């Protein structure tokens, strides 16, 4: 996370609707069409530069057919920036309670960021219920595929693959039938935010 990102993101957050206004407009549109609602929300996140379209354009995509005749696609994500040396040094000397707890927690919404911390002042998260639990829905700033979105538990709990995971995926698919949705592995060896915070991912393909 660079100082340029931390400085630029608040500037793109001046005109868009506030988080509460965003939720209100989104759910009004959901009453008519889930696809129109996500189209509006995605366009908002592109226009306020939370979804980094210019950076995403650098990604490399290989498409082809396997020996069995199945479609195959490999994506190399070149859009997500590496931490600069200052960010690494600042993170190494950080003390006290971690805030936000992880890159997916809801307190990232509106967070101004800093060295070693993601700039999220222009982040918008849609509040929703999945299988009776409060969850959130947002787009990934550095997408691997079209309209790459993240569904996350509003509570900071570790990811676990079980029967509830399948129930959640079905509930999400019913809510947004024009999107596909899947889940990461919950293997401890995978050192990423997908393990420390319960979530699923989806999008268009």
Where is each model-derived feature located?
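A long, hydrophobic alpha-helical segment
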Residues: 179-189
């Amino acid at each position: 996370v660079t100082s340029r990102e931390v400085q630029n993101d608040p500037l793109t957050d001046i005109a868009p609707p506030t988080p509460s206004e965003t939720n209100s407009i989104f759910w009004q549109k959901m009453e008519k069409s889930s696809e129109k609602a996500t189209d509006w929300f995605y366009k908002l996140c592109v226009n306020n530069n939370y979804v980094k379209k210019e950076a995403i354009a650098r990604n490399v995509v290989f498409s082809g057919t396997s020996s069995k005749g199945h479609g195959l696609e490999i994506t190399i994500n070149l859009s997500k920036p590496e931490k600069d040396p200052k960010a690494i040094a600042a993170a190494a000397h950080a003390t006290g309670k971690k805030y936000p707890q992880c890159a997916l927690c809801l307190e990232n919404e509106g967070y101004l960021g800093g060295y070693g911390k993601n700039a999220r002042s222009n982040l918008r998260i849609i509040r929703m219920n999945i299988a009776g639990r409060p969850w959130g829905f947002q787009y990934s700033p550095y997408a691997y595929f079209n309209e790459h979105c993240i569904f996350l538990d509003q509570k900071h709990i570790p990811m676990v693959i079980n029967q509830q995971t399948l129930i959640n995926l079905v509930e999400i698919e019913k809510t947004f039938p024009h999107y596909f949705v899947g889940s990461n592995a919950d293997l401890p060896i995978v050192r990423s935010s997908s393990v420390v915070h319960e979530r699923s991912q989806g999008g268009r393909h």
